[in-house]
Amino acid sequence: MSSDLKQTPLYQNYVDRGAKIVEFGGWAMPVQFSSIKEEHNAVRYEIGLFDVSHMGEIEVTGKDASQFVQYLLSNDTDNLTTSKALYTALCNEEGGIIDDLVIYKLADDNYLLVVNAANTEKDFNWILKHKEKFDVEVQNVSNQYGQLAIQGPKARDLINQLVDEDVTEMKMFEFKQGVKLFGAIVILSQSGYTGEDGFEIYCNIDDTEKIWDGLLEYNVMPCGLGARDTLRLEAGLPLHGQDLTESITPYEGGIAFASKPLIDADFIGKSVLKDQKENGAPRRTVGLELLEKGIARTGYEVMDLDGNIIGEVTSGTQSPSSGKSIALAMIKRDEFEMGRELLVQVRKRQLKAKIVKKNQIDK
């Protein structure tokens, strides 16, 4: 493995715990600690912990911060509060998704954008390029933050025991600042990437290991990127670089809820997204279940039963929960019909599949 890979503050901790390390977006990250299936099931049925400190954090501050983030992002940021985060997209002029991200309003003139690890530099440069007309400061503060995700049906009860705040009623994308956890001051966000209840914890980078080790004392399973991928795929959650790209719009990528082109404010890509909202996008993302043995991998062709190509697989795996072979695919809009049978070209075979809902959590 290349010695040029970036490491999170927990790298040596993974190694000491016997994790299998892989390259991901320029980082050395654990793909698994025990087994992907064991870690997956821990999150689906109990509780698991992920290090996501490789994610990027970009801070926007200044007098025009609120107008600037709205100009950059496809969702309506005007109603953000200092306790409610928002999932949104950073789009180009054609409506293509440069990145999908979560924005936190930390104060009236202070916003934190949490972006995908592989896109941090690209996003930062894009934001810098568009800030000229706004009175704002933009900083890449990724090296100041550690980020952990504690996920699973038992996560809320555990966090409630450990923090000095009541998190019982916290809803999706609500967050609290200034929360004390193992002596560290953190941002606690009710969010995740698994389809389960849970929290994402933002801390000072120097506190990351203390919090990680502290949580693992409570019968919490450490989990790697392998389980993170199978969990998000079962939940029908897209991955940027596969299911979302700069040539895929929110309406094509299945995140239409993150696009609000009818608001008064202007934003980059608005005209294209307004047209797609009103008239439909040329393609759409669907869930697939293979009806024959095989795994649908990224880039595999999707065909109708006559062998005509109508799209391609963007992500696929075998579901540890159901044992089924599941996928997300991008197909022509007019070819969509729930339950319809299709073919997927898996190596030299054409395997039958059917269109199903994207969220395929089965437990």
Swiss-Prot record:
It comes from the Bacteria. The keyword Transferase applies. It is an enzyme of class 2 (transferase). InterPro entries: GCS_T (IPR006223), GCS_T_bac (IPR022903), GCST_C (IPR013977), GCV_T_N (IPR006222), GcvT/YgfZ/DmdA (IPR028896), GcvT/YgfZ_C (IPR029043), TrmE/GcvT_dom1 (IPR027266). SUPFAM superfamilies: Aminomethyltransferase beta-barrel domain (SSF101790), Folate-binding domain (SSF103025). Gene3D superfamilies: Aminomethyltransferase beta-barrel domains, Aminomethyltransferase fragment, Probable tRNA modification gtpase trme, domain 1. One of its GO terms (biological process) is glycine decarboxylation via glycine cleavage system. Its EC number is 2.1.2.10. One of its GO terms (cellular component) is glycine cleavage complex. The glycine cleavage system catalyzes the degradation of glycine. The glycine cleavage system is composed of four proteins: P, T, L and H. Belongs to the GcvT family. This is Aminomethyltransferase. It comes from Staphylococcus aureus (strain MRSA252). The lineage of its organism: Bacteria, Bacillati, Bacillota, Bacilli, Bacillales. The gene is gcvT.
